[in-house]
C-alpha cells in the first residue's frame, strides 16, 4: 500500500508505503498505515489530496484519493489584537481553546461581573452557559442595546432566554457534520472557503461534527443568518408549494447568526469551536 499527500499541482509533500497482509478469499483485513502529515507546507493553508494505491507484483489493484485541508498552526493564531479587552464567562473550558489561539482574555465568574461597566470590555464571550435568569437576560439586552458586543458560544439555552422573540428553539441534528454559509461575504468568513465549514477534526474516531445544534429562528431585519445546517437525506412529499417550503424549513436551522439590538450586536454560534486546537477552520 503506497500513500502520498500531494498539493494542487500534484507535487508530493509526503509519502510512504505499508505492507498489506494476504487476504483470504471473501475475507477482510484492516491495517492502520502510519501516515505522516507533511512537516513543511508551501503556504499557510493548503488544499491537498491523500492518495492510496494498492499494488501486488507491480499490478495496481485499487486506487483512492481524498481531499484534505491542512494549515500551519500560525495561520489562525494571534489574529486578535492584544489591546482588545475580552471577558469570558467560561462554562465549558473555552479558556484553553482561546489560549491555544493566543487570544488574551480575562475570565469572570458571573454575568453581573461580565457586564461590569468598569471592565470596559471590547467583547464579552459567554461559552457553554445552559441557565440564565430573567434578570440576567434583561441585563444582557440592556448592555447590548447601549453598544455592547456579545458572543455566545454553544450556549443555545441562554441565547434563547435572552432573545426569545428571535430564537424559538433548536434541533440536535443527526447529521451535524456539514454546515453551509448563508452569507459568503460576511467578514467572519474571511479566509474560509465556501465549502470548508464541514467535517471538523478532533483526532477521534467519531462523526466529525461541525455543529452541536441548529437554531430555529424567526426571520427579522435585526437577524442576519450567517450559517446553517439541514438534513441532507429526506423525502419531500407532494402537496402545495407552501407545504413543501414549510417541510424544508422544518429540516434546517442556523448554526451562526448575528442579532442587532439598539447600538450593539450579538453573535450566536453552535459551531464546534472547541475543536480549534485540532482543526484550522474551527479555530479561524
Model-derived features: where do they sit?
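Loop/turn elements at helix/coil->beta-strand transitions in domains of secreted/extracellular proteins
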Residues: 83-84, 119-122, 146-149, 262-265
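Extended, composition-driven regions rather than compact fold-specific motifs
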Residues: 173-174, 185-237, 244-262, 270-275
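A glycine-rich, often tryptophan-bearing local segment used as a flexible ligand/cofactor-contacting loop or short
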Residues: 130-214
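Short hydrophobic alpha-helix segments
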Residues: 9, 16-18, 64
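Aromatic-Pro/Gly-enriched surface loop or interdomain linker
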Residues: 45-47, 57-123, 127, 154-158, ...
Amino acid at each position: 500500500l503506497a500513500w502520498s499527500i500531494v498539493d494542487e499541482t500534484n507535487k508530493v509533500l509526503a509519502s510512504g508505503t505499508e505492507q498489506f497482509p494476504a487476504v483470504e478469499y471473501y475475507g477482510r483485513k484492516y491495517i492502520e498505515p502510519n501516515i505522516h502529515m507533511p512537516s513543511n507546507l508551501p503556504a499557510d493553508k493548503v488544499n491537498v489530496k491523500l492518495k492510496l494505491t494498492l499494488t501486488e507484483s507491480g499490478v495496481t489493484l485499487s486506487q483512492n484519493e481524498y481531499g484534505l485541508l491542512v494549515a500551519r498552526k500560525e495561520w489562525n493564531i494571534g489574529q486578535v489584537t492584544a489591546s482588545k479587552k475580552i471577558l469570558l464567562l467560561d462554562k465549558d473550558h473555552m479558556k484553553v481553546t482561546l489560549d491555544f489561539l493566543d487570544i488574551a482574555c480575562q475570565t469572570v465568574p458571573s454575568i453581573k461581573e461580565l457586564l461590569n461597566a468598569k471592565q470596559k470590555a471590547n467583547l464579552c464571550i459567554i461559552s457553554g452557559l445552559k441557565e440564565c435568569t430573567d434578570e440576567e437576560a434583561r441585563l444582557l439586552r440592556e448592555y447590548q442595546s447601549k453598544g455592547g458586543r456579545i458572543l455566545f458560544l454553544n450556549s443555545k439555552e441562554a441565547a434563547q432566554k435572552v432573545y426569545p422573540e428571535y430564537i424559538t428553539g433548536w434541533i440536535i441534528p443527526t447529521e451535524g457534520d456539514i454546515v453551509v454559509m448563508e452569507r459568503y461575504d460576511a467578514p467572519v468568513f474571511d479566509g474560509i472557503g465556501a465549502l470548508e465549514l464541514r467535517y471538523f477534526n478532533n483526532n477521534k474516531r467519531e462523526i466529525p461534527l461541525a455543529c452541536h445544534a441548529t437554531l430555529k429562528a424567526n426571520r427579522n431585519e435585526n437577524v442576519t443568518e450567517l450559517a446553517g445546517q439541514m438534513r441532507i437525506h429526506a423525502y419531500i412529499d407532494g402537496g402545495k408549494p407552501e407545504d413543501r417550503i414549510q417541510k424544508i424549513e422544518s429540516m434546517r436551522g442556523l448554526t451562526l447568526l448575528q442579532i442587532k439590538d439598539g447600538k450593539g450586536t450579538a453573535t450566536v454560534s453552535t459551531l464546534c469551536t472547541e475543536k480549534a486546537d485540532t482543526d484550522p477552520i474551527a479555530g479561524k
